[in-house]
Amino acid sequence: RKWLLYDTKIKDFSFKFYADNKKAEVSIDIEMKDELFRNAYYEKIWSLESILEDEIGAFSKDEFYVLENGKVISRIWVEKNGVSIFNKQTWPDIFEFFVEKMDAFERLFYEYEDFIKDI
């Protein structure tokens, strides 16, 4: 499957995949250096909470998520535990999770794109 939304046209606002030896994640990362803009986009997405939950299911959010390098971003994400990039038997589960959740994030973004971009 080709991901349609590789560029949101919003600087420092992106959809990301992540997997390690314990879990897989799909996230919206809001990485603006200007905290006012970062907060504004986070609040826009968060205002769609019930729609977001309908589309992607249970999710986590953190307005002040600290990356390993110390950078503070805002992140909304879903994760699947019990999978590992080092265990080929869990790869189908990881790919299925990525397809399902990224598709849901893309649909939400496209449906509410004008609202989200209106900052």
Question: Where are each of the predicted segments found?
Answer:
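Ampiphathic alpha-helical segments that act as solvent-exposed interaction surfaces
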Residues: S47-E55, G82-I119
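Polyanion-binding interface signature
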Residues: R1-N81
